[in-house]
Swiss-Prot record:
Protein name (database record): Small ribosomal subunit protein uS19
Domain of life: Bacteria
Gene Ontology molecular function: rRNA binding; structural constituent of ribosome
UniProt lineage: Bacteria, Pseudomonadati, Thermodesulfobacteriota, Desulfuromonadia, Desulfuromonadales
Species for this entry: Syntrophotalea carbinolica (strain DSM 2380 / NBRC 103641 / GraBd1) (Pelobacter carbinolicus)
Family: Belongs to the universal ribosomal protein uS19 family.
Keywords tagged on the record: Ribonucleoprotein, Ribosomal protein, RNA-binding, rRNA-binding
């Protein structure tokens, strides 16, 4: 269910502090985060976040099209290897 408009988007406070501290958008510094639930706000455009997917950190460069989405949407947690292999080859 969507979040109420009167509440505004959820962004982890530590993420906001790190983004302000890192020295501006477009800097080479990657901001490491476990907060997949944080909403991408316009101030994050140009930053690169390393979003944890449960196993490793996936680099996500934020563009204008991503505003309003969650950080976790761009770091998939499941890998799909396809369905079972062809059984004819096993005989």
């Amino acid at each position: 269910m969507a979040r109420s408009i009167k509440k505004g988007p959820y962004v982890e406070e530590s993420l906001l502090r790190k983004a302000d501290f890192e020295g501006g958008a477009g800097s080479k510094k990657v901001i490491k985060t476990w907060s997949r639930r944080s909403t991408i706000i316009p101030e994050f455009v140009g930053y690169t976040f390393a979003v944890h997917n449960g196993k490793k950190f996936i680099p996500v460069f934020v563009t204008e099209n991503m505003v309003g989405h969650k950080l976790g949407e761009f770091a998939p947690t499941r890998t799909y290897y396809g369905h079972g292999a062809d059984k004819k080859g096993k005989r």
